[in-house]
Amino acid sequence: MKGFKDWVFALSNSMASSRPLLGSDPFFRDPHQEQDNHSQAPAAPQPVTLSEPPCSTSSDLEILPPLSQQQVPLESLYQSSIDLNGKKHNPLAKIGGLQVQFLRLVQRFGQSQNNILVSKVLYRVHLAMLIRAEESELKNVKLRQDRAKALAREQESSGIPELDFSLRILVLGKTGVGKSATINSIFGQPKSETDAFRPGTDRIEEVMGTVSGVKVTFIDTPGFHPLSSSSTRKNRKILLSIKRYVKKRPPDVVLYLDRLDMIDMRYSDFSLLQLITEIFGAAIWLNTILVMTHSAATTEGRNGQSVNYESYVGQRMDVVQHYIHQAVSDTKLENPVLLVENHPSCKKNLAGEYVLPNGVVWKPQFMFLCVCTKVLGDVQSLLRFRDSIGLGQPSSTRTASLPHLLSVFLRRRLSSGADETEKEIDKLLNLDLEEEDEYDQLPTIRILGKSRFEKLSKSQKKEYLDELDYRETLYLKKQLKEECRRRRDEKLVEEENLEDTEQRDQAAVPLPDMAGPDSFDSDFPAHRYRCVSAGDQWLVRPVYDPQGWDRDVGFDGINIETAAKINRNLFASATGQVSRDKQRFTIQSETNAAYTRNFREQTFSVAVDLQSSGEDLVYSFQGGTKLQTFKHNTTDVGVGLTSFGGKYYVGGKLEDTLLVGKRVKLTANAGQMRGSGQTANGGSFEACIRGRDYPVRNEQIGLTMTALSFKRELVLNYGLQTQFRPARGTNIDVNINMNNRKMGKINVKLNSSEHWEIALISALTMFKALVRRSKTEMTEENEEEKIVNFLVS
């Protein structure tokens, strides 16, 4: 059995197939109100007592006399077994009465019951009844439809009871498209004022009348203004007044009128379609019929030759439908189209009705399509298909990736103070802090000038430069030790609460200027953004946009940083960046606070992060405590909470760090993240071996292994990172990553100030890559050309 959504969009390629049941937008009727106030089922007369009382519903249907010899109320004909047990308001019985009314109108408008449009409406009504019917009623649904056809023929031929069916139609469109003229053509008499030179309708008014026994009420509205600088405000005011007017009594059908001869590929009413969608919601298009006026105008091509009428109409309708799809952000909708001509000189048939160039009499078709829309809308109200279908892009269903959140959570290490890096270096230097510096024990060296250096042999030059490099390393190590002693002494003085510990006010100094152009262009405004570092611990800088326009400011955001040591044990820092352009607005901020206790250097840390992701914001809270369990061992426990897209993700982790001597650092952690009914587990192990001259020379090699488990899948990742100096003036960085899914990458970065041959190797590699790419593109073009030639031949 098809679901409701399949029922709505199953037949979307024809004129009637676009009639899904109305949406749940407040613009449309409330189903309870519709049942109480606007139900179209005729009032049931007093039932005729039969000679023998029925025993059941099925036996009652079998012993009924011919329809021409009785007057049986519709409610009794379509009652189900549930109604016989006491329910008076059965929606299936009311739909049965609605079917009879629809079939009577089919005959009245001269349509055959075998008409494709009639068949599709009946099919949808039948399918809707099957969806809502209970198991005991399924057998009677088909029987009701057959009885409805027979009863409709009988009632329409006899005219008893009188048809009680009404239409309430809202008319929308620009000024001058023929809204009032179309209303007059439907009634066959002037009921609404028209004027060819000025707007004929300046206020909302209802025009009522009867067409073929159907009570029709048109809600005529003021025309929308053409596109201009002030039209949007005026059109919005008109639409808001219309929305207030139809709020109490919503229309059954919406007509959107436009001139067929004024539509081209440069359709200028897209902003109007967007405005209608914004005011009423996308659901208004679910029961909207596109009415094209001036449909009998002469059709000519670009060269003045006549074109096929059907293709002429189809092209223009495709344009309008395309922009409606863009306005509602949905391509499933296909609105039905009605072609209308109101000019007195239009061709007429013997009955005096307007005939279009394709031979169609548009007035009966107009009424019949409005009836189909009304019937499907009433079925939706009676069966209470609410929130079953919607137009536009679905609501954001983006969910965060638990493995990604867990990976970020495990890597994130909370700050424990402003001098966190300095503390780690001090621990390494304290081991040999009291020893005499090796630099002071070195013999003096004579620095050679350029002329003397050139006279040395190649081996002597190498020995001389190596000696200078060695002395430079020892000198830098001596400076680090002196800095470490200074910080240690300041800490001792601070702990003794001496007055000399007050920090001196730092003088404001200008920061280095941002990179400017090579030329001295006076129009370049970089001088307006010079940054100053003052003693207030706030740093404000613009964010540079590398893709900016020439002679433009080139900055599209602002960056703010601050860090403060509130007291001896409390440290706080905050970083924020805001960027905005015409397409998006991005924000990133990080806030950290750390409190340190002297007991085993225990540190409590808290971090709050905010980051934009598309149209959503990601909030992240993380807290943890770090405790030095042994002299060279530190344990860290942390918890985290992340909010994204209205969902929350909670995680926890345990991390342990061990220092082995001066050069080996081992780190292991494990954690878990939960959210949205899912769980991700992971952990990592890292071993870092530092160089002999660390931290003066940042030479080290690191081995990492991470494991993530999610939905019974395990992903292992192996990594190798190394930085070393194979020779003086040459640095090499290697980064290798691989996983158990046979995926990975290798990055090698080489930097040298002496070996210029490396630049030639890089240039040759890039040249070969460009040549290979051009050959690939030429091969693809040749293959495409061969395929085209083969198809043509």
Curated annotation (Swiss-Prot):
MF GO annotations: GTP binding; hydrolase activity; metal ion binding
Disulfide bonds: none
Coiled-coil segments: 130-157, 410-442, 477-503
Region of interest called Homodimerization, as start-end residue ranges on this chain: 195-198, 259-264
Gene: TOC90
Topology class, membrane: Single-pass membrane protein
One Pfam short name: TOC159_MAD
InterPro entries for the chain: G_AIG1, GIMA/IAN/Toc, P-loop_NTPase, TOC159_MAD
Function according to Swiss-Prot or TrEMBL: GTPase involved in protein precursor import into chloroplasts. Seems to recognize chloroplast-destined precursor proteins and regulate their presentation to the translocation channel through GTP hydrolysis. Probably specialized in the import of nuclear encoded photosynthetic preproteins from the cytoplasm to the chloroplast.
Tissue-specificity statement: Expressed in seedlings, leaves, flowers, and roots.
Free-text remark on how the cofactor is bound: Binds 1 Mg(2+) ion by subunit.
Binding residues annotated for Mg(2+), in chain numbering: 180
The protein, known as: Translocase of chloroplast 90, chloroplastic
Keyword Mitochondrion found: no
Basic and acidic residues composition bias: residue spans: 27-37
Region feature G2, mapped onto this chain: 199-203
EC class: hydrolase
Cellular component terms (Gene Ontology): chloroplast outer membrane
EC numbers on record: 3.6.5.-
Species this protein is from: Arabidopsis thaliana (Mouse-ear cress)
